[in-house]
Amino acid sequence: MNRQGDKGSVLSGYRVLDLTDDKGMLCSRYLADMGAEVIRVEKPGGSAKSPFSWENLGKRAVTLNIELEPGQEVFRRLAENADVLVESYPPGYLEALGLGYPRLSQINPRLVMASITAFGQRGSYRDDKSCDLVASALGGQMYVCGEAESPPLKPFGSQSYYLAAIFAAIGVMLALWHRHTSGRGQHVDISLLECVAAALDHVLVRYFYQGAVAKRQGSLYWSNAFRIFPCRDGHILFSLFQQWETLVEWLASDGMAEDLTDEKWRDRGYRLQHLDHIIEVLERWTKSHTVAELVEVGQLMRFPWAEVASISRILASPQLKERDFWVEVELPESGKRYKFPGAPVKLSRSPWRVGIDNNR
């Protein structure tokens, strides 16, 4: 079917209906960026304002009250000609309106419907109230974040929503691929809880195989291989054990190796047992240097070190600029142009379509 969409884009010619809140707006944004025609269905009187504008780049929008029969009839007609529906209502809500997958799949057997909910379409928690905080807590994310002596902490931002949106986009693409061979759509069930737990595979697998319970250890990486250290003018992500002899020689050249030149420290097991002492010595050393000094020389020595970049430093990143990561888009509600994150994935033959509908 010939529809709007950039020719050559991965999803050019596909139509997506968007019935999501902040749990799923990013999913349909990615589909729009890949060339799909995304129609966002909003309640009358409601519109997406900043900070959610960036999650709705490239989408068209219609207002429709799907709780009333006239709006439901219009939505069914939209679904009849759609390829994908992404929604994030509580389980059972759309079914009660006659807009659930069983009914819509009768109207359009090729429809792929992705539902992003707190706990999925079944299970004992299905109807429980939730949010990003709940998903982070129940999914184990909070348990492993924070200092050893502090209570569990939540990572910054709505991480469960971002994870769910990405997994949902993958699920939609897989369902569309399956439709090419089967001719039929299917229901993609996305659970925030499961998305968070899936992202903790390294923590869970260690427990399954070794019985090891992950502990909160601040900025120290779970494998003890990396840690964040303070410098004179910021912070650096620092590898602790790679090329140990080279690192100690560097400290010694600055007169700050202390006892790390002793033969006993060449043993990795000994270093792991006395990690606190190594951290103390390294911290005194990093505080004597700027971030740029350590990163520049460290990279020359092939250490995987990096500045812990502030927001302003991210915006000024030459790497992101050279790869055209940032896009400027004029928002219809204000007429002002703003900079937004662009495509995290670049395809050599299928360019992303970022924000093109916002300027029409």
Locate each region found by the language model.
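Aromatic-enriched alpha-helical interface/lid elements that frame and gate functional surfaces
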Residues: A225-M301, W305
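Flexible, small-/acidic-enriched active-site or ligand-binding loops
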Residues: N2, P152, L331-R360
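Conserved small-residue-rich beta-alpha loop and adjacent elements
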Residues: G8-G46
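Short glycine-/small-residue-rich Rossmann-like dinucleotide-binding loops
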Residues: D21, I66, P90-P91, T117-A118, ...
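Conserved PLP cofactor-binding pocket of PLP-dependent enzymes
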Residues: V297-L320
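Active-site-adjacent "lid/gating" segments in soluble enzymes
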Residues: Y30-M34, L97-L237, F241, E249
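A structured beta-alpha segment of the ubiquitous adenosine-cofactor-binding alpha/beta core
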Residues: L17, E55-Q106, K287
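Glycine-rich phosphate-binding loop and adjoining beta1-alpha1-beta2 segment
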Residues: D33-N65
